[in-house]
Amino acid sequence: MAEYKNYTLNFGPVHPAAHGVLRLILELDGENVVRADPHVGLLHRGTEKLAEFKPYNQSIGYMDRLDYVSMMCNEHAYVMAIEKLLQLEVPERAKYIRVMFAEMTRILNHLLWVAACGIDLGAMTVFLYAFRVREDLFDCYEAVSGARMHAAYFRPGGVARDLPTQMPQYQKTRFTSKRKAKKLNEPRQGSMLDFLDHFVVDFEKSLDEIDTLLTDNRLWKQRTVDIGTVTAERAKELGFTGPMLRGSGVAWDLRKTQPYEVYHKLEFDIPIGANGDCYDRYLVRMAEMRESNKLIKQCVDWLRANPGSVLSDNHKVAPPKRNAMKNNMEELIHHFKLFSEGYCTTEGEVYVGTEHPKGEFGVYIKSDGANKPYRLKMRAPGFAHISAMDELLSGHMLADTPAIISTIDVVFGDVDR
């Protein structure tokens, strides 16, 4: 009798469902996955080592490029680690602005996730719906920083500047008619806070549309229910965090369990799943977007009623005012030295973890008292999830592989660093 051998298949790194540069070596028995061996490192750029050769305030831009779809959430952990090292006090208004943008970033991440997951599983309409909404939030990024993705808006001690009193306006182009531009600009006539008041109302309707398309869709449930199941105990043993852990029924969220910034003053719930499968992870992320929308609304209301400073008055980290630099040579010298040499910190080591859209994103800094870290280490949430790929895929069909990879929500900018 002929001997049967398992088939070895390379999945990725150039595959539309690989979500970046994931390379999986799959061992197949027919169409059943017997073993999955993930290979990482194809997007390694040496970010940690680069940051160890630059002053603290010159590495904020690197953080945006780690998980490049959750930009400000990466910045958030990094600047909080520096503040902990320097024992900096952050103005209350800056804390609310940070939380508001962190929740906007969570929505941006989850919208991209549901869009990409929809395409992977054959539901392309969701992609178009989600990207339409993402443009509104990118407008907010652009309004505060001038950049639509890599904002570098957070600073040790606060944020770069206060919220703008007007939003960017759409212009008539080859692709945007005058009538369409006028309609798009209607909610953008006031300040950013006015625009966000419109957004939180419209976003609920957009989520309802996605819910209608997917949640009770027979084909969607066939592709996700009982696929990639992980029990609560096993999820904890594997080091899962974020929606991967909460999808298995564990109510662990650093915003609640280890509150930072102003999360302890805000009201929100922690959505959890029951079965730990792909479908539960989808439901958790959809519910998280609704909770983030509530948090944005609470921040908008507080910010409207409480004007104030958005950056620490500690001159060690805060640049001088523009008017002062025009009239005072010492202020100009201080500005030059701050942005060329940076500032020295006390000796010591700190770790700060934040609730990133994909899980716990942590920054560890060891300082020897210089103006740059002696050692910078980052905890990428996706690395633990990728490490469990063999367990998640084994026993499933090859066609289930895109669904499982997609609901892990991995981006290799932070995994490979």
Swiss-Prot record:
Keywords: Cell inner membrane, Cell membrane, Membrane, NAD, Quinone, Translocase, Transport, Ubiquinone. Disulfide bonds: none annotated. The keyword NAD applies. Its EC number is 7.1.1.-. It is a peripheral membrane protein. InterPro entries: NADH_Q_OxRdtase_suD, NADH_UbQ_OxRdtase_49kDa_CS, NDH1_su_D/H, NiFe-Hase_large. Its main location: membrane. It comes from the Bacteria. It is found in: Cell inner membrane. The keyword Lyase does not apply. It catalyses: a quinone + NADH + 5 H(+)(in) = a quinol + NAD(+) + 4 H(+)(out). GO terms for molecular function: NAD binding; NADH:ubiquinone reductase (non-electrogenic) activity; quinone binding. NDH-1 shuttles electrons from NADH, via FMN and iron-sulfur (Fe-S) centers, to quinones in the respiratory chain. The immediate electron acceptor for the enzyme in this species is believed to be ubiquinone. Couples the redox reaction to proton translocation (for every two electrons transferred, four hydrogen ions are translocated across the cytoplasmic membrane), and thus conserves the redox energy in a proton gradient. NCBIfam families: NuoD, PRK06075.1. NDH-1 is composed of 14 different subunits. Subunits NuoB, C, D, E, F, and G constitute the peripheral sector of the complex. This is NADH-quinone oxidoreductase subunit D. It comes from Francisella tularensis subsp. holarctica (strain LVS). The gene is nuoD.
